[in-house]
Amino acid sequence: MPIPNNPGAGENAFDPVFVKDDDGYDLDSFMIPAHYKKYLTKVLVPNGVIKNRIEKLAYDIKKVYNNEEFHILCLLKGSRGFFTALLKHLSRIHNYSAVEMSKPLFGEHYVRVKSYCNDQSTGTLEIVSEDLSCLKGKHVLIVEDIIDTGKTLVKFCEYLKKFEIKTVAIACLFIKRTPLWNGFKADFVGFSIPDHFVVGYSLDYNEIFRDLDHCCLVNDEGKKKYKATSL
């Protein structure tokens, strides 16, 4: 697989793990914080499964970039858990390779993006970032938590064009099977999940539930409890 450079096309992408519509686990089977439990329906993807899948994604990414230097953009805040685990595995895989390099394999950068209030997209994208002009002529991998409608990544990739980046690829932990999806595909995907609002593993509902270890479904009571006052 060549280094991807057609954001949204998902050309030559590996298949994600498919989570069926009726998949899930009883909350009592896992360690769930007591203050969250009544606001959740079920565990959709357990923490251990998420971690192992991220390790495999790191392996796939390393195979594609091989020993080419690349820069990883973390889209905060939802991607933080995925990004941290991915970097850990990429570093370990690279450190155990026999190749000597004069510089680190990858650089890391952080961009704050926000497009949701409650469980709805606001239709606008707020971007706060460091100076990304250093990415000119570089390979860039965007790390996103979830592709829902796909609108966030379309707008963000458009934003990146002014920096004259060499290649742009996308890694996302989850892609949601929703009729609202605009067709934007990632190049490295962890899981294909059903059309439900998910929280946990750094995914939030109005900044709540990020600290859940597992990917879970939030129920209507939870949405009402933590609903923002305005869109």
Curated annotation (Swiss-Prot):
Q: Which Pfam families match?
A: Pribosyltran (PF00156)
Query: What SUPFAM superfamilies does this protein map onto?
Result: PRTase-like (SSF53271)
| CC annotations in GO | cytosol
Query: Record-annotated residues binding Mg(2+)?
Result: D204
Listed under catalytic activity are:
IMP + diphosphate = hypoxanthine + 5-phospho-alpha-D-ribose 1-diphosphate; GMP + diphosphate = guanine + 5-phospho-alpha-D-ribose 1-diphosphate; XMP + diphosphate = xanthine + 5-phospho-alpha-D-ribose 1-diphosphate
InterPro entries documented for this protein: HGPRT, Hxn_phspho_trans, PRibTrfase_dom, PRTase-like
Provide the disulphide bond pattern: none
Entry's family note: Belongs to the purine/pyrimidine phosphoribosyltransferase family.
Q: How does it assemble?
A: Homotetramer.
Name of the protein described by the UniProt record:
Hypoxanthine-guanine-xanthine phosphoribosyltransferase
Q: To which species is this protein native?
A: Plasmodium falciparum (isolate K1 / Thailand)
